């Protein structure tokens, strides 16, 4: 609510208002530099906001950061893994961090690992994984957490078509289970299979929200226009603002 913040006292995002309901996936889209990553970093508590509120299930990030963060799982664009821990140890760390029932969590972990063809790699260290495999590990660990809010940053990078399909199925499953999902992406063709509501972030503010069809209408796109045309229009607006 009215989130304003950035880096070194410079506001990159200004009065951002965004609500995600249980059982809803929202896509945050916009040009590079529009403020998507900055918004996510504030949501994760990695940056201190200048103004506004971030509340999840009645818990304020500012007032109770520890409780807030236990309800959030994050899939970064660039995989972040501990080099000295095996895949199995990463999974066990998630179970410990989120206080999951050990037996139930391991049953779920095995399902997820099989889905992404990692079931025979539990003893592997991150150095043995390709970039795509590291991304799959991040997906597995984040969905294993069973958090109320899943924050996903550009998830399709490095994933093969089967992994993309499996990821989309997991997002749909999470939404059906009344979880909240916030996803940033440029790959709208795939994202629209799992996300019904999109918010366009432009010049640090939410310019419009709605389905992709509603966003097409807002920017005057023709039915025959590709999604690339949306980014061309956003770029033209940004250039005009800075002229």
Stretch-by-stretch model annotation:
Residues 161-163:
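Helix N-cap at the start of a conserved alpha-helix in ABC-type nucleotide-binding domains
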Residues 209-210:
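ABC ATPase "signature
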């Amino acid at each position: 609510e009215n989130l304003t913040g950035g880096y070194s006292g410079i506001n990159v995002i200004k009065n951002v208002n965004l609500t995600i309901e249980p059982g809803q996936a929202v896509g945050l889209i916009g040009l590079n530099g529009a403020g998507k990553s900055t918004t996510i970093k504030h949501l994760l508590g990695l940056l201190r906001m200048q103004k506004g509120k971030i509340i999840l299930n009645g818990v304020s990030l500012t007032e109770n950061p520890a409780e807030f963060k236990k309800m959030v799982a994050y899939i970064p664009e660039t995989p972040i893994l501990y080099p000295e821990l095996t895949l199995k140890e990463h999974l066990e760390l998630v179970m410990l961090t989120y206080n999951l029932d050990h037996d139930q969590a391991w049953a779920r972990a095995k399902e997820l690992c099989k889905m992404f063809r990692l079931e025979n790699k539990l003893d592997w260290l991150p150095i043995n994984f390709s970039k795509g495999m590291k991304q799959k590990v991040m997906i597995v660990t984040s969905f294993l957490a069973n958090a109320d809010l899943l924050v996903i940053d550009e998830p399709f990078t490095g994933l093969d078509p089967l992994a993309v399909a499996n990821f989309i199925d997991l997002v749909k499953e999470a939404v059906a289970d009344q979880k909240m999902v916030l996803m940033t992406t440029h790959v709208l063709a795939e994202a629209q299979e799992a996300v019904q509501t999109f918010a366009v972030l432009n010049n640090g503010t939410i310019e419009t929200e709605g389905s992709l069809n509603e966003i097409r209408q807002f920017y005057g796109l023709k039915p025959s226009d590709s999604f690339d045309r949306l980014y061309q229009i956003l770029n033209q607006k940004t250039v005009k603002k800075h002229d």
